[in-house]
UniProtKB/Swiss-Prot annotation:
Membrane topology note: Multi-pass membrane protein
Native source species: Drosophila melanogaster
Protein name: Protein O-mannosyl-transferase Tmtc1
GO cellular component, one term: endoplasmic reticulum membrane
Principal cellular location given in the protein's record: membrane
Transmembrane segments: 23-43, 104-124, 135-154, 155-174, 190-210, 246-266, 289-309, 329-349, 423-443, 447-467, 474-493
Biological classification of the source: Eukaryota, Metazoa, Ecdysozoa, Arthropoda, Hexapoda
Gene field: Tmtc1
Cell compartments where the protein resides: Membrane; Endoplasmic reticulum
GO BP of this protein: protein O-linked mannosylation
TPR repeats: 518-551, 552-585, 586-620, 632-665, 671-704, 705-739, 740-773, 774-807, 808-841
Topological region Extracellular: 44-103, 211-245, 310-328, 444-446, 494-859
Disulphide bridges: none
InterPro entries given in the database record: TMTC_DUF1736, TMTC_O-mannosyltransferase, TPR-like_helical_dom_sf, TPR_2, TPR_rpt
Similarity comment text for this entry: Belongs to the TMTC family.
């Protein structure tokens, strides 16, 4: 007699055609809806996290991914954000290697990750929800929800996308492990959870979710193979030892992960500003408590009705709750009451199914009855046991593939789904809620990406329940479908339009003016200034200061607007106010110093300001890279000032100080400092040290021709090393054949050797490479004059005049060549034009005197 073998339930059960269609439809919907993000650029935080991040561009070693935060700042730095996401930064680095700084590749990866996440949400819903329509509703809602726009359209949201994918995969892997306690699935779960942690720290809660899922799992399923082999003791028993082992491993892994993150890795002493999280700086305990209790409600409100969305919810975007009579406290009470009700209902259903799940007992016992009764197993169907639970025919399909309409199947699904749906909503959000510890923001839409999985599961659970309750009325089901279609349509349109806001910074900042005016207007003013729209920028920045007079960035940006319009007297007070409000703002010192220089009579004050800015340590500054860049430029400006005043020793000292004070400076900028120091030392005739500094510059930037040119110029000052100097000029040309300055400086060297014909060829090549460069065009004319090719020289001098018609020396040079050619009248006109532009122009006066022409003579 043949006895059928019992099949073990598996998460890899074959999907039905309807499931495959729903899965493909949800993923396709997610892809199509975000297609309009593929032509977007780098906006807002993308610039700092990608464009200015040396960990992404390869400017730093790969090992630095483990030592630096998400923004490229060392974790030990006082200004570090503390966000450690090496896998996400690694993905950006791979994007850079594949396509450089072309944004299309970055956006495509984000869209594909969202499609994968939608796919996985569908599969997760399929393990929890009793109705296929509920699963479809959950997957479709996740695909179109507008709250996901920041995570998908904003490139820094990749941390949330990738962590969500790993989080859901870890959950699905552990569901498989729960069926038969295989070690492979458990190890895979742990690896996926740790990968999620390496994408974003909040995803470590995946291990908590897996443990909760195990605790809520029904009894009896994993031992069905023993029953099939005739072990009656496995009928209702559950192997608590194996479950305890799995839970212990999860707990140990969670503790190890937390220990490694909090103890082994550096923890920055970051002090978030009041603008980032004003409630955290509130002195009143009750205001802090009531506001932080309300923030999860506000976040849930975005999930419920995502009409008002903003790139930033800091400052006063969410006003603090200062009294018990604030109406928002009612919403807070209702929200937490609803959570308790869901958990209470779930625990009640759980109790009703304990200690024995009779549907599971039936599925386990009927194969045993078949062995006892042979082929007459059907005679056992419909029997009722002593506990009055009727036995039914067994199903050998995976529970994850069944959408049963029986009351027991519904009860089993309803037992876990509300609790696990709530867990998906709450657990990943807790670390960012400000309830456990303060974080550097009030609200952030991309933080909701993973918690929204729980929201979509609960929505799908409710929709599926309604769908099953009206199964006898096609009109009611049609109304449900219309309602679902309307909701998805409204969300889809909102998502599509919100994607357009994320295409460029101007539109993004304009979209948030009504929610966070000072932040949005301040950033918008900076964008308008960069576009050269100075009047709009000034108006916008003054509106910003009307909302928040103590905003240092707004004062600084307003100063930049005045500076770009050459209105230095108005720019200086703005920079001074920015420094007063934020003393560590090095770039404000830099701009203040350059503005003072431009006024002409404040050189000593400018030197003092630049020296102060260059020596700022920048304790607690958020953007360490920008701070170091500003200090570096302050040192360079300081050396230029000293050099122009003839204080070469002071200039060299400033550059030496910069090399010691800025150890984190990128190699390219360190090379510039060595190069400048070498030039100054050469002027001081310290040849050996000058040569040493220039060799250091070449070692740091071997692909930069400028270092070779400067080294060649230094060697050329030594008459015994002319051949060696020329070899370095030739190397520079080989390295950068399209660099005009390489040809220009080599030509200078050849002219010093009176090799004028060779020099002319290089002059012509340099001028062809930079046809709008006045100096290079003038040098061609000079080279032709030295070869006595005066007619050709005249043409080049005339071209130079067209490039700089307001430059007195350009007209004087043209006058000189005309004078040499005997064109006296035209030459005098050129000299007069030069004197008109610069009344004290010495060369024009001298040449007119040689021609016996008075200044106002008109021949």
């Amino acid at each position: 007699m043949h006895t059928p073998k019992c099949r073990r339930p598996s998460m890899s059960a074959t999907l039905s055609h309807k499931d495959l269609a729903g899965l493909a439809g949800c993923s396709a919907l997610a892809f199509v809806l975000y297609l309009n993000t593929l032509n977007a650029g780098f906006v807002y935080d993308d610039r700092r996290a990608i464009l200015a991040n040396g960990d992404v561009t390869g400017a730093r070693p790969l090992a630095n991914l483990l030592r630096n935060d998400f923004w490229g700042t060392p974790l030990v730095d006082s200004g570090s954000h503390g966000s450690w996401r090496p896998l996400c930064v690694l993905s950006f680095r791979l994007n850079y290697l594949a396509g450089g700084m072309t944004p299309l590749g970055y956006h495509l990866v984000n869209v594909m990750l969202h499609c994968v996440a939608t796919w996985l949400v569908f599969l997760v819903a399929r393990t929890l929800l009793p109705s296929r329509m509920g699963v479809l509703a959950a997957g479709a809602l996740f695909a179109v929800h507008p709250a996901h726009t920041e995570a998908v359209a904003g490139l820094v949201g990749r941390a949330d996308l990738a962590s969500c994918v790993c989080y859901l995969l870890a959950y699905l892997s552990y569901r498989r492990h729960m069926l038969n306690r295989e070690w492979g699935s458990l190890i895979l779960t742990i690896m996926l959870a740790l990968a999620a942690l390496l994408c974003k720290e909040t995803a470590i809660t995946a291990l908590l979710l897996c443990g909760l899922c195990d605790v809520l799992s029904p009894v009896g399923r994993e031992n069905s193979d023993k029953v099939c082999d005739g072990s009656i003791s496995g009928l209702a028993s559950f192997n608590f030892q194996r479950r305890f082992r799995s839970l212990s491993i999860l707990g140990f892994t969670l503790l190890c992960g937390l220990y490694c993150r909090l103890s082994l890795l550096p923890r920055p002493s970051t002090a978030f500003s009041a603008a980032d999280n004003p409630t955290a700086h509130e002195s009143c305990f009750w205001t802090r408590t009531l506001t932080f209790l309300y923030l999860p409600v506000a976040n849930f409100g975005i999930l419920l009705w995502p009409q008002e969305l903003s790139f930033d919810w800091g400052m006063e975007a969410v006003s603090r709750i200062r009294t018990l009579w604030d109406a928002r406290n009612i919403l807070t009470a209702g929200f937490y009451g609803s959570l308790v009700a869901i958990l209470w209902k779930g625990s009640g259903l759980r109790s009703a199914a304990s200690p024995m799940d009779f549907a599971e007992v039936a599925n386990i016992s009927l194969p045993l009855l078949r062995r006892l009764g042979g082929n007459s197993c059907h005679t056992w169907l419909g029997l009722t046991c002593d506990c009055h639970h009727q036995l039914s025919a067994p199903s050998y399909r995976s529970a994850s593939a069944i959408y049963s309409t029986s009351s027991k199947s519904k009860s089993a699904s309803w037992t876990a789904a509300p609790i696990l749906g709530t867990a998906f909503l709450v657990l990943p959000f807790l670390p960012a809620s400000n309830l456990l510890f303060y974080v550097g923001f009030v609200m952030a839409e991309r933080v909701l990406y993973l918690p929204s999985v729980g929201y979509c599961l609960l929505f799908g659970l409710g929709f599926g329940h309604l769908w099953q309750r009206v199964n006898s009325s096609w009109r009611s089901r049609l109304m449900l479908l219309c309602g679902l279609a309307l909701l998805l349509g409204v969300h889809g349109v909102r998502t599509f339009r919100r994607n357009l806001d994320w295409r460029d910074e101007e539109q993004l900042f304009r979209s948030a003016i009504s929610i966070n005016p000072p932040k949005a207007l301040g950033n918008l003013g900076s964008v308008l200034s960069a576009q050269g729209r100075y009047e709009e920028a000034e108006l916008t920045l003054r509106m910003t200061l009307g909302h928040r007079p103590t905003m240092a960035d707004a004062h600084f940006n307003l100063g930049v607007v005045h500076q770009k319009q050459l209105n230095f007297s108005s720019a200086i007070p703005c920079f001074r106010r920015a420094i007063e409000l934020r003393p560590q703002l090095a770039v404000a010192y830099l701009n203040l110093g350059t503005s003072l220089i431009s006024l002409g009579d404040h050189r000593q004050e400018a030197i003092s300001v630049l020296r102060t800015g260059a020596r700022l340590e920048g304790s607690g500054v958020r953007d360490r890279g920008a701070h170091v860049e500003a200090r570096y430029t302050c040192y360079l400006q300081l050396s230029v000032l000293y050099r122009s005043d003839g204080r070469l020793q002071d200039a060299a000292a400033a550059l030496r100080e910069s090399l010691k004070a800025l150890p984190l400076l990128p190699q390219k900028q360190r090379a510039v400092l060595h190069l400048r120091l070498g030039e100054i030392l050469a002027e001081l005739q310290d040849w050996n040290e000058a040569e040493h500094q220039q060799r250091l510059a070449m070692q740091l930037q071997p692909e930069q021709g400028a270092a070779y040119v400067t080294y060649g110029q230094t060697l050329a000052r030594n008459g015994s090393r002319l051949a060696e100097a020329e070899s370095w000029f030739k190397r520079a040309l080989q390295l950068a054949p399209l660099e005009p300055s390489s040809h220009h400086h080599y030509a200078d060297f050849l002219e010093q050797q009176e090799r004028h014909h060779e020099a002319l060829g290089l002059r012509l090549r340099a001028a062809a490479l930079a046809p709008q460069d006045y100096t290079l065009q003038s040098c061609v004319a000079d080279a032709l004059r030295l070869l006595n090719r005066l007619a050709e020289a005249e043409l080049w001098y005339r071209k130079a005049v067209t490039l700089q018609p307001m430059a007195a020396h350009a007209h004087a040079n043209l006058g000189a060549i005309l004078q040499m050619r005997g064109l006296r009248k035209e030459a005098v006109a050129c000299y007069h034009k030069a004197l008109e532009l610069q009344p004290g122009h010495a060369i024009s006066r001298a040449n007119l005197a040689r021609m016996n022409v008075h200044k106002h003579e008109n021949e």
